[in-house]
From Swiss-Prot:
GO biological process, one term: cell division
Domain of life: Bacteria
NCBIfam families: clpX (TIGR00382), PRK05342.1 (NF003745)
Gene3D superfamilies cross-referenced by the UniProt entry: 1.10.8.60, ClpX chaperone, C4-type zinc finger domain, P-loop containing nucleotide triphosphate hydrolases
Cysteines paired by S-S bonds: none
Organism expressing this protein natively: Rickettsia conorii (strain ATCC VR-613 / Malish 7)
Name of this protein: ATP-dependent Clp protease ATP-binding subunit ClpX
Swiss-Prot/TrEMBL keywords: ATP-binding, Chaperone, Metal-binding, Nucleotide-binding, Zinc
Length: 425
């Protein structure tokens, strides 16, 4: 057997330096990289991180400006808006401080927990914040998550969605916002430790702890379970802001039980208001109530900022229908305009729509489905007829009559009518 004496010299695949010209030469599948190129790549990544952070932090509005923009889209919830505005502002100022290299005071991350009834604006608040700050944003449903190794979705898939939202720009993804909805559904099934594994409750809380606190997570770019041989993307979650939301149905009973128990005997308040609504009860929320509900103390500790949202009343729902920039009625009016038609809604009809949404206990979320049902036939017809004015009255909402359609051509005045009529003074 003849051994080749003059073997080909190993060189860096990037800078072409030979092995003896560098300190280290690291081998990969058919490629090599030297220590100098690794240092250069590290410097480039650090510089890109600084640029990405500077773009975000240089454009951070003040808390008052954030609140002002939120007011354009979200009706009511003033206290929640204020808390969120301050929390988000401080979060991104913290990133700027950390990136500057200062370490005289260690600033910890403050994730947020939103508690409020269905349709009160939790998701919309998170979405609007991401839009204001122009950062990558993704939403996840906690009910689909399970502990690793069980049927369901791994928590790392949440990070994958954020990467996709940032177009796999790791530096941008590491400064993004993740909203986890229905977090109350991963509450522990029982206060007492169970001998059976709670893979969709406490198990998910445990799995979320690390990524919420801050860790370098291995994210599978093609999803975790179908492609086990893929290369992982390393994502640092230390600067990702986590916002969790949930309705926490039944926590009002826990709060009431605690407050009533603490007011027995001579210290009892005889003027206890038995007519308190859920919003007022939630204002008395304590950490122990969340623990009693089923969140483990470690998980609650990762969510230091807790705010509650009010239940929307009829007036708030009417405002949601008509006032915000993305108001539902405005959206439908624009749809009709695209077909050379007009949509006019009586104020009494809006009141009835709001009452129906309240009866269904779906909050603002139910408004669109009610309007969609009311306007379906009209939208079907105006696309063909054109130049039509569609009027929705209280009787139409109650199903007593069909929407009133009149031709704009035949009317004496072609002048555009206001979107809402008979508004009370």
């Amino acid at each position: 057997m003849v051994v080749e004496a003059d073997k080909k010299a190993l060189i860096c695949s990037f800078c072409s330096k030979k092995q003896h010209e560098v300190k280290k030469l690291i081998a990969g599948p058919a490629v090599f990289i030297c220590d100098e190129c690794i240092d250069l790549c590290t410097d480039i990544m650090k510089e890109e991180n600084k640029v990405a952070l500077k773009q975000i932090t240089s454009s951070i509005p003040t808390p008052q400006k954030i609140c002002g923009i939120l007011n354009d889209y979200v009706v009511g919830q003033d206290q929640a808006k204020k808390i969120l505005a301050v929390a988000v502002y401080n979060h991104y100022k913290r990133l700027e401080y950390v990136q500057s290299g200062n370490n005289d005071v260690e600033l910890n991350k403050s994730n947020i927990l939103l508690i409020g009834p269905t349709g009160s604006g939790k998701t919309l608040l998170a979405q609007t914040l991401a839009k204001i700050l122009d950062v990558p944003f993704t939403m996840a449903d906690a009910t689909s998550l399970t502990e690793a190794g069980y049927v369901g979705e791994d928590v790392e898939n949440i990070l994958l969605r954020l990467l996709i939202a940032s177009e796999f720009n790791i530096a941008k993804a590491q400064k993004g916002i993740i909203y986890i909805d229905e977090v109350d559904k991963i509450a522990r099934k029982s206060e007492n430790p169970s001998i059976t594994r709670d893979v969709s409750g406490e198990g998910v809380q445990q799995a979320l702890l690390k990524i919420m606190e801050g860790t370098v997570a291995s994210v599978p770019p093609q999803g975790g379970r179908k492609h086990p041989q893929q290369d992982f993307v390393q994502l640092d979650t230390s600067n990702i802001l986590f916002i969790c939301g949930g309705a926490f149905m039944g926590i009002d009973s826990i709060i009431t039980s605690r407050t009533n128990h603490s007011s027995i005997g001579f210290a009892a308040n005889v003027n206890i208001d038995k007519e308190k609504n859920n919003s007022e009860i939630l204002k008395s929320l304590e950490i122990e109530d969340l623990t009693k509900f089923g969140l483990i103390p470690e998980f609650i500790g990762r969510l230091p900022i807790v705010t509650t949202l009010d239940e929307l009343d009829k007036e708030a729902l009417i405002t949601i229908l008509t006032k915000p920039k993305n108001a539902i009625v405005k959206q439908y009016q624009k749809q009709f305009e695209l077909d050379d038609a007009e949509l006019v809604i009586d104020y009494s009809a809006l009141e009835t729509i709001a009452e129906k949404a309240l009866a269904k206990k779906t909050g603002a979320r139910g408004l669109r489905s009610i309007l969609e049902h009311l306007l379906l036939d009209s939208m079907y017809k105006v696309a063909e007829l054109k130049k039509q004015r569609v009027t929705i009255t209280k009787e139409v909402v109650n199903g007593l009559v069909e929407p009133i359609m009149t031709s704009l051509i035949s009317t004496k005045s072609n002048k555009k009518q206001p979107i809402i009529t008979d508004i009370p003074a």
